[in-house]
């Protein structure tokens, strides 16, 4: 689930913003996370050249479309907020860490540009939190925990669920640290 941020407007109603909106982080934090996010994305794109084949391109495109649609479905959490699935664990488990990160980054960038989910100045923050942190967390959990509990259907499902849950937790922690350092 991606967390929603509530900001009260002058009529005391709640406006919900998915992702981190423009102006929520200072310029330094926005620039730093932009460099980190797009530097990482560029490195992953260059390293994924060996994976680019017809079947991987189609699968990556379908996974991006699926995650895009799943992120459009919001459900209430509490106190005027709602959440949606992030899809990081799903993308990484199906596509691997490199294509999974690229897939999630494409989804976040399209949402920012076409639907104003977040904004251009906050794009680095959103890519870092929703693509890089969720991908890294999911891949680490799946790769290393499966060694301890074995590879069968039950263990793969349980590790996948754990990866999905913990990727959201670590993404939230990353946002909290970023906001503590560079929030406005």
Where are these regions (language model features)?
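Short, small-residue-biased leader/transition segments that mark boundaries at the very start
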Residues: 1-7
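Hydrophobic transmembrane alpha-helices
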Residues: 11-90
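Hydrophobic, aromatic-rich alpha-helical transmembrane segments
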Residues: 23, 27, 48-57, 97, ...
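Hydrophobic alpha-helical transmembrane segments
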Residues: 31-32, 57-62, 86, 101-105, ...
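Lipid-exposed faces of alpha-helical membrane segments in multi-pass integral membrane proteins
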Residues: 32-39, 62, 66-69, 106, ...
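Short helix-perturbing small/polar motifs within transmembrane alpha-helices
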Residues: 130-175
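Membrane-helix interface motif
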Residues: 173-184
């Amino acid at each position: 689930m991606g967390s929603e941020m509530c900001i009260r407007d002058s009529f005391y109603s709640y406006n919900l913003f998915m992702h981190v909106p423009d102006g929520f982080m200072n310029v330094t934090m926005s620039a730093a996370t932009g460099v980190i996010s797009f530097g990482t994305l560029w490195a992953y794109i260059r390293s994924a050249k060996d994976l680019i084949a017809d079947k991987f391109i189609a699968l990556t495109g379908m996974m991006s479309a699926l995650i895009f649609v799943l992120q459009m479905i919001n459900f209430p959490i509490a106190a005027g907020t709602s959440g949606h699935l992030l899809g990081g664990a799903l993308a990484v488990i199906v596509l691997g860490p490199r294509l999974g990160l690229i897939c999630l980054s494409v989804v976040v960038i399209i949402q920012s540009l076409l639907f104003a989910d977040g904004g251009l100045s906050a794009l680095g923050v959103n890519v870092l939190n929703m693509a890089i942190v969720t991908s890294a967390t999911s891949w680490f959990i799946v790769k290393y925990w499966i060694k301890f509990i074995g590879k069968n259907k039950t263990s793969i499902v349980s590790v996948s669920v754990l990866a999905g849950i913990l990727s959201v937790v670590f993404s939230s922690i990353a946002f909290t640290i970023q906001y503590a350092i560079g929030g406005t």
